Design a protein with these regions (language model features):
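The conserved cystathionine-beta-synthase
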Residues: 22-40, 47, 90-108, 114-117, ...
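Tandem CBS (Bateman) regulatory domains
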Residues: 1-19, 53, 57-92, 96-106, ...
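Acidic (E/D-rich), amphipathic helical modules within compact regulatory domains
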Residues: 31-67
Length: 135
């Protein structure tokens, strides 16, 4: 079991696109937050033509609220793209699960968007889903 786990690829354990939050750049932030909440993950991917434009995490929203100090309700009518992290840390679907977990630990993140060789968003690796294969 442990030997198999060491050799596992991200694509074997990633969350498929229909199970995590995605919005287009022109959707309102409220819609992005609603989808993030519905997915029960702390991330929403901003996607246009299947290409990842960026991500928004619940932590990004908290930090932005403290930084800007405008009423929370005012954020609801902002566009999602206005709050996006445009160069998110990503991984490839054929990367090893072990290397992805190490990257998540190093960068202190819970979620990694998964791209194919053409840069198309094909999944999301969530830390809990990843580490359960090692315990």
């Amino acid at each position: 079991m442990f030997i198999k786990t060491i050799k596992m690829k991200i694509k074997e354990v990633m969350i498929t696109p229909e199970k995590f939050a995605q919005v287009n750049p022109n959707e309102f932030l409220k819609e992005a937050l609603d989808k993030m909440t519905d997915s029960k993950l702390g991330i929403v991917c901003i996607v246009e033509d299947n290409l990842l434009k960026g991500v928004i995490t619940d932590g990004d929203i908290r930090r932005k609220l403290l930084e800007v100090q405008k009423p929370f309700s005012a954020f609801f009518i902002d566009y999602a793209i206005d709050h996006v992290i445009t160069n998110p840390i990503t991984c490839k679907e054929n990367d090893s699960l072990k290397s992805a977990i190490k990257l998540m630990e190093k960068k202190q993140i819970w979620d990694l968007p998964v791209l194919d060789d053409n840069g198309i968003l094909v999944g999301l690796l969530h830390l809990h889903a990843a580490i359960k294969h090692f315990i």
